Amino acid sequence: VLEVTGSERLEFLNRMLTQELKPGGKWLGPRACVNSFWLNRKGRIDADLRVLVLDGRVLLECDAFAADRTVSGLGAFIISEDATIRDLSSSMHRLSLHGPTASVLLDAVREDSGVPIESLVEHPNAEI
């Protein structure tokens, strides 16, 4: 997981990624999630990203093996923009549950840990 902060984070990412972050002239709002690619100078895919817009920051979820080159590749294009990229991989993790029994498994995890399911869900469109 990579974090992009700064007052020009959305403008910067909008220029660098394949997905439009300002569809219809309006920036994506907090908790919006889109998929995108980061392309290298030859137009080849360097990273397949999930872009999660939050208040004051944007999280880029990518393959762990692509994190370093994505940070250095995108960082090389930050010249005068107010944007900072850092790798949060050592402090954040993601678990995805898919399929018809996903909610049952999540209930079991919650019962074992005592953590409410609602606190585990980050995406507003997630179904519990």
Predicted regions and their residues:
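Basic, glycine/lysine-rich polyanion-binding surfaces/domains
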Residues: 1-128
